[in-house]
UniProtKB/Swiss-Prot annotation:
It is found in: Cell inner membrane. This is Phospho-N-acetylmuramoyl-pentapeptide-transferase. Catalyzes the initial step of the lipid cycle reactions in the biosynthesis of the cell wall peptidoglycan: transfers peptidoglycan precursor phospho-MurNAc-pentapeptide from UDP-MurNAc-pentapeptide onto the lipid carrier undecaprenyl phosphate, yielding undecaprenyl-pyrophosphoryl-MurNAc-pentapeptide, known as lipid I. Keywords: Cell cycle, Cell division, Cell inner membrane, Cell membrane, Cell shape, Cell wall biogenesis/degradation, Magnesium, Membrane, Metal-binding, Peptidoglycan synthesis, Transferase, Transmembrane, Transmembrane helix. It comes from Burkholderia vietnamiensis (strain G4 / LMG 22486). HAMAP family: MraY. One of its GO terms (cellular component) is plasma membrane. It catalyses: UDP-N-acetyl-alpha-D-muramoyl-L-alanyl-gamma-D-glutamyl-meso-2,6-diaminopimeloyl-D-alanyl-D-alanine + di-trans,octa-cis-undecaprenyl phosphate = di-trans,octa-cis-undecaprenyl diphospho-N-acetyl-alpha-D-muramoyl-L-alanyl-D-glutamyl-meso-2,6-diaminopimeloyl-D-alanyl-D-alanine + UMP. The gene is mraY. Its cofactor is Mg(2+).
Length: 389
């Protein structure tokens, strides 16, 4: 919004050219989202407390968690408010990637909000059924996947539509330009052509998978938000590189026109996340809830797809991957041993993985900070792929 205003008034006030610089707007988006979160945080927490949306705590989990019962949840709305305001203020609202990422983020946020609302307001411990939740996630994920298959491949919406119609006329069998290929880290001249169907399937699993992986990780005070901020910031760097014809050529990456604007969104997400951490750090005053976790995971997945860094997301989000695998392995092993031996057995003391470490004697803050450190190292490793190719 401010970019459009600056471009309109630029002839009358030359200092407004500052607003056209992507890096300046990214910094301001961070500050704006951070400020909104810090200022509005107490009001949001107070309103959530008045709504009596207290978090229910598992009685079979670590005993130290029982004191958290009643802490207001659904605090992810604070993050979404910061992201929305900062992105709309400092982003280029004519950029198609901004809108598709916002659509996925807030679409998944609505799903999470409904799930949380049913759990804590209607006192329905099931919330949305898994089938219902995955259905709506799939609707949003597939829509985004189809759009991005053609949007990543072309420079503007007119050419996106032309490419889509050409695909339809080809009997749904046409391939995609090279910039839509799956990029392999550390290999500068090797990529894997996905085709339209391969792109759609991969994108669907990345977006929906990332959303649910972040949601599973959200189990301790401050645990998930810092990895989200770190991974989001790293993806913002990739977006800046991919969106620049100069840097992308120098670093041997495909140039994706318009992708650089995602730096604004990632910066807003980082600022909003840090503001939320102010109130979510141990002992937490508010929990994120599904409204925040599903939204942020979907956002990370969508940005990673646009900048063609799906594999790098898998690396940088290693904590999310480990948490998800721990649940899958725990459930699978329990079912297998119950069928084989007549009683279910566990691989871990408790899943997701962070609870296993708690029950192994780690304090909650130790688990959280160590997971942060691991994520920081993984993000630095992921960023090294910019040059080590």
């Amino acid at each position: 919004m401010l970019l459009a205003l600056a471009q309109w008034l630029q002839g009358d006030a030359s200092f407004l050219r500052l607003f056209t610089y992507l890096t300046f707007r990214a910094v301001m988006a961070t500050i704006t989202a951070l400020g909104i979160g810090l200022v509005c945080g107490p009001w949001v927490i107070r309103k959530l407390t008045q709504m009596k949306v207290g978090q229910a705590v598992r009685k079979d989990g670590p005993q130290s968690h029982l004191v958290k019962s009643g802490t207001p949840t659904m605090g992810g709305v604070l993050i979404l408010i910061g992201i929305a305001v900062a992105t709309l203020l400092w982003g280029d609202l004519t950029n198609r990637f901004i809108w598709i990422v916002m659509l996925v983020t807030f679409g998944f946020g609505v799903i999470g909000w409904v799930d949380d609302y049913r759990k804590v307001v209607h006192k329905d411990p099931r919330g949305m059924s898994s089938r219902e939740k995955y259905f709506w996630q799939s609707v949003i994920g597939l829509f985004a996947a189809v759009y991005l298959a053609f949007s990543v491949s072309e420079a503007n919406n007119v050419r996106v539509l032309d490419l889509f119609m050409a695909w339809v006329r080809s009997g749904l069998s046409m391939g995609l330009p090279a910039r839509a290929d799956l990029m392999l880290p550390f290999l500068k001249s090797i990529s894997y052509p996905l085709g339209v169907w391969g792109f759609i399937v991969l994108t669907y699993f990345v977006i929906v998978g990332a959303s649910n992986a972040v949601n599973l990780t959200d189990g301790l005070d401050g645990l998930v938000i810092m990895p989200v901020v770190l991974v989001g910031a790293s993806l913002g760097v990739f977006a800046y590189v991919m969106g620049s014809s100069v840097y992308s050529k120098y670093l041997l990456f495909p140039h994706i026109p318009g992708a650089g604007e995602l730096l604004i969104f990632c910066s807003a997400m980082g600022g909003a996340g840090l503001a939320f951490l102010w109130y979510n750090t141990h002992p937490a005053q508010v929990f994120m809830g599904d409204v925040g976790a599903l939204a942020l995971g979907g956002a990370l997945g969508t940005v990673a797809v646009i900048v063609r860094q799906e594999i790098v997301l898998f690396i940088m989000g290693g904590i999310f991957v480990a948490e998800t695998l721990s649940v899958m392995l725990q459930v699978s092993w329990f079912k297998y041993t119950k069928k084989r031996y007549g009683e279910g057995r566990r691989l871990l003391k408790m899943a997701p993985l962070h609870h296993h470490f708690e029950l192994s004697g780690w304090k909650e803050t130790q688990v959280v900070v160590r997971f942060w450190i691991i994520t920081l190292m993984l993000c630095l490793f992921g960023l090294s792929t910019l040059k080590l190719r």
